[in-house]
A protein has these predicted regions:
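Short, well-formed alpha-helical segments that are part of the catalytic scaffolds
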Residues: 6-26, 32-34
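Short beta-alpha junction loops
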Residues: 34-38, 110-113, 188-189
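Active-site-proximal specificity loops/subdomain of glycosyltransferases
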Residues: 34-73
Length: 232
C-alpha cells in the first residue's frame, strides 16, 4: 500500500482540503489525525480512501506517526502547508527505489551539520523544500513534511510523542539508532511550494516550538547529528 500520513488542526481547514485534493489521487490511502476537531469533516468522512481520527490528546506533529504501517507499505508523511505537485509520489518513489528502500529514507527538506565556521556563521547548511537542490545529499536531520520511507523505517508513536512539536528530531534519532540513513533529494525550485498564509505563521510549530529551543530536544539532536556516516 502507498499511504500518506497527515496531522492537522482546525485553523488550517482550508489548507487541509487543498492538501487532500493534491495527495489523494496519488496514494492508495490517506490517514489523518485531526487535533482539536469536534467532528471529522464531511469530505474526509465520506471518502473511502481516508481514515481520520480525533485524538484524545495533543500529539502535535507526532500525529503523523499515530497509525502503524505494514513493513512493506510505502509511507509519505506530509504537512498541510506544503503544495504537492501531481507527480510528487511517482517521482519521489522512483528516487527512493534508486537509492534503495532498505536502510534508507528520503525527503526534500533537511539540514547538514558542517561543523564550526567563521564568527557569526551557524554550523549547518539548511535546505528548504521549496528551494532547488541539484544532487542527492546525506542529511543530518530530515524533515517529516516531505518524507518517503518503507513502513519498516517508520517508528511507533511512542518514540516520537515525547518530543511532539519537533518530531523531525526524534524521528532521525530513531533512524540513527537503527542504522537507517536519511537522504535529501534533488528538485527544481518551486516544484514544492510553501502554502502557509502569513496570518497562520504565528501558530506554526516552527514559531511555537522550534524557536523556543527546548533543552530536551536540543540534547537529543546533538546525540546523533554530528555522527552520521553519510553526512557531515
Amino acid at each position: 500500500m502507498i499511504r500518506a500520513h497527515l496531522a492537522t488542526f482546525p485553523p488550517r481547514r482550508r489548507l487541509l482540503r487543498k492538501t487532500c485534493d493534491a495527495i489523494l489521487p496519488q496514494v492508495d490511502h490517506l490517514f489523518v489525525v485531526l487535533k482539536d476537531y469536534d467532528e471529522v469533516p464531511g469530505f474526509l468522512a465520506k471518502n473511502p480512501k481516508v481514515t481520520a481520527i480525533i485524538p484524545d490528546r495533543d500529539v502535535k506533529d507526532a500525529g503523523k506517526f499515530w497509525f502503524t504501517p505494514a513493513p512493506d507499505d510505502i509511507v509519505f508523511t506530509i504537512d498541510d502547508d506544503i503544495g504537492y505537485p501531481p507527480d510528487y509520489v511517482t517521482r519521489t518513489l522512483a528516487q527512493l527505489n534508486a537509492i534503495g528502500p532498505e536502510g534508507n529514507v528520503v525527503g526534500y527538506q533537511g539540514n547538514i551539520y558542517i561543523g564550526p565556521r567563521g564568527e557569526g556563521q551557524k554550523p549547518w547548511d539548511n535546505y528548504l523544500f521549496h528551494q532547488p537542490a541539484e544532487a542527492v545529499l546525506g542529511a543530518s536531520l530530515l524533515g517529516t513534511g516531505t518524507l518517503c520511507a518503507r513502513g519498516s523505517s517508520i517508528p511507533p508513536l511512542s518514540e516520537i510523542e515525547p518530543n511532539a512539536g519537533a518530531c523531525d528530531i526524534p524521528f532521525c534519532a530513531w533512524l540513527f539508532g537503527r542504522g537507517i540513513l536519511p537522504w535529501m533529494l534533488p528538485r527544481e525550485g518551486g516544484w514544492l511550494s510553501n502554502d502557509l498564509p502569513r496570518n497562520l505563521k504565528p501558530s506554526s510549530l516552527f514559531q511555537t516550538v522550534a524557536r523556543q529551543g527546548h533543552a530536551a530536544y536540543r540534547g537529543l539532536l546533538w546525540s546523533f547529528a554530528t555522527r552520521w556516516p553519510h553526512a557531515n
